[in-house]
Amino acid sequence: FTQSMYYLAKSLDDRPVIVNDGWEHTSCDVITIHNYTQDADVLFDNCKDLTKSSEKSIKAAKKPVFVRGFKYNGQPIIVSEYGGCCMNKDVNKGWGYGLGADGEEDFLSRYDKLRKALKKLKFLSGYCYTQFNDVQQEKNGIADEDGNMKVNLEKLKKINV
């Protein structure tokens, strides 16, 4: 099915097509990975061999990057979802990935370590933190549902520069 949709989309538009964001890729123009581990070393280890293996397992998501019979063919690779840490104060209101952060400093420390782990992967074309703001039961945003920041924006900016 995804291959049919890929070729249909390509026949209508020549822009890049992603058939299944995060895992179990078939034919596609960009490889996207979801990995929600809170451990920077585990994140690095899970991603470091993505260009070498056709069926590398994403340990945090427990799903393979490629469907059996498909492999990496030089496409750009993006970690399109990583992180997903919630604050401990929000745990009873919903969920996030892993253990909740004990406050702003703990959250920023995790965020920084995860980002640095991804920066070491020179083959990555990009990465995107999950997620900007809370959505319903998902309390893993850097802002709440109303857009109020949970962390100091200047501190977050310093980490990203």
Give the location of each predicted region.
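Catalytic cores of secreted or luminal carbohydrate-active enzymes
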Residues: 141-161
